[in-house]
Structure formats: structure tokens, C-alpha cells
């Protein structure tokens, strides 16, 4: 869940304006201590707010200022974590590829995003600002360019992640086309070792001068294959092996909740 300091911070901000009411309720509790009652506080909040870190037009400061003027208690930001789609040519799909990319938090810098939210949260007393991102955990391709029916599926299935406040956690979100990660090396290492071994054999053959007209092209081929299959992928799922069901989404949910975040479906 969202870390306790955020909750305490929210209550602190709320009580600045409503402290007298809470004192009255406390007095009532003292008068009738045996009567158990729950105190519910209704707050006004907005979620999935985009800034100029991704597809929004306004800065975090401008949005916080607007929220405070309109007496909004909580703003949960939802900028796109990574807004990138790739299609590559097999067997070198991670090297020779076409990339379609839009502005995103990880493109502009997660550290700046978090720092700006925290700084403005300190400046605006009434409104609590909570960092959050909209994520695209998975998509997959069908068809081909040759047949003119190439289609990206599940691109519109998005999850909202609220409450992470670590730059490293944002950068290690299990998203396609994202940052290098050591999290999935154990799942991807076998292919890398096998291909890397074959590459080293071809290097040895070239060094010894065996059939260089054949072994040099083979060495270059396996050099590219080794690079293409490195084990430091940002996600264990790629878009070239069809629908993976709910696994990519559950993988992101498990990662985010392990970091103390809340996760919600945004688009399905």
C-alpha cells in the first residue's frame, strides 16, 4: 500500500483546516469512552493527472496550484511511465528495429519527476501530491509488413501505479522497451550462454584461420545474436511470441505492490 508517511502527511494537511472539528469529536469520545465509533473523513481528490512529463500541457507546479485554488485535497499523478512501441526484424529484433516513441517519465527522467512532485508537495500546504504513473506492461504483434496486416494487440491495456517514491523503483518497472535490468537474468541466461559459447567457438575458428570465408560471416552473425539475446531485459515478455495472458500484468502488479504501491486498471 501507499507508505504510511503519505497517509500521515495527508491527515496533517487535512487537520490544518479542520482541527477544531476533530477536537470536538475527541471531546465527545472523552465524554462517552465506552462508545466505539469510527471517524470517516471525506476528501476531494483527482487521479490519473498528466503533466508535461508525458502527454499533459501543464507543469506539476501549475497543476498543484490549480488544485489548491479549487480546494482539492489529493492529486494522484498518472504520467506515462514509458510510451514506446518497437517492431524489429528477426532474428535481430532488438537491434534492427523501428521505434515509435512519445514523451514519458522514464524518457525525461524519473528522478526529476519525483523530485518536482516532492518539492511542490512541500510548497502547497493544503493539497497532497502523490507520484504515480500509467504503465503499458505488454503488447504483442500479429501479421506482417509484407502482407500489410501488421497489428499491435493489447497496447491499450494499461495499469496505474500510485505511491512509489524511489527513482530506482520507477526505472525497474517491468515494461517492454525499457531500462536494463538484472531481475530476469536467471530466466534469460541459458539462451545467452549457448549463443555466446557458439560465438566464442567461431572467434576461435577465425583466429586459427579455419575457412575464413565461412567462419568470419558466421562470427559476425553470432556476435549480433549474442548482443540481441543479452539477459538484462526490462521484461521477461517480448511482443513476438503471441498473447501471454495475464502474466505480464500480474508481473507488474507483484513488482509494484512489493514496493509499497497501489495498482489499478486504467484501460482494459
Question: How should these model regions be labeled?
Answer:
Residues 7-38:
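Hydrophobic secretory-pathway targeting helix
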Residues 5-6, 127:
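N-terminal amphipathic/basic-hydrophobic helices that include classical n-h-c signal peptides
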Residues 11, 15, 29, 248, ...:
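Glycine/proline-rich, flexible active-site/cofactor-binding loop segments
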Residues 38-267:
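A metal-dependent hydrolase metal-coordination microenvironment
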Amino acid at each position: 500500500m501507499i507508505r504510511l508517511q503519505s497517509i500521515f502527511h495527508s491527515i496533517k494537511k487535512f487537520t490544518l483546516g479542520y482541527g477544531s472539528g476533530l477536537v470536538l469529536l475527541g471531546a465527545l469520545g472523552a465524554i462517552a469512552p465506552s462508545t466505539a465509533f469510527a471517524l470517516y473523513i471525506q476528501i476531494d481528490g483527482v487521479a490519473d493527472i498528466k503533466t508535461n512529463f508525458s502527454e499533459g500541457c501543464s507543469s506539476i507546479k501549475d497543476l498543484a496550484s490549480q488544485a489548491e485554488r479549487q480546494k482539492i485535497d489529493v492529486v494522484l499523478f498518472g504520467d506515462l511511465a514509458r510510451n514506446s512501441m518497437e517492431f524489429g526484424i528477426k532474428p535481430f529484433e532488438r537491434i534492427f528495429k523501428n521505434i515509435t516513441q512519445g514523451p514519458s517519465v522514464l524518457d525525461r527522467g524519473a528522478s526529476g519527476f519525483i523530485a518536482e512532485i516532492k518539492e511542490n508537495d512541500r510548497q502547497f500546504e493544503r493539497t497532497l501530491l502523490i507520484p504515480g504513473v500509467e504503465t503499458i506492461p505488454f503488447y504483442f504483434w500479429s501479421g506482417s509488413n509484407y502482407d500489410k496486416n501488421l497489428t499491435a494487440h493489447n497496447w491499450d491495456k494499461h495499469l496505474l501505479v500510485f505511491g512509489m517514491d524511489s527513482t530506482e523503483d520507477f526505472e525497474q518497472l517491468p515494461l517492454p522497451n525499457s531500462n536494463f535490468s538484472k531481475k530476469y537474468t536467471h530466466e534469460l541466461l541459458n539462451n545467452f550462454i549457448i549463443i555466446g559459447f557458439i560465438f566464442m567457438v567461431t572467434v576461435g575458428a577465425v583466429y586459427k584461420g579455419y575457412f575464413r570465408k565461412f567462419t568470419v560471416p558466421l562470427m559476425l552473425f553470432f556476435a549480433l545474436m549474442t548482443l540481441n539475446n543479452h539477459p538484462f531485459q526490462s521484461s521477461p515478455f517480448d511482443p513476438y511470441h503471441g498473447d501471454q495472458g495475464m502474466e505480464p500484468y500480474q508481473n507488474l502488479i507483484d513488482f509494484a505492490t512489493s514496493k509499497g504501491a497501489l495498482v489499478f486498471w486504467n484501460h482494459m
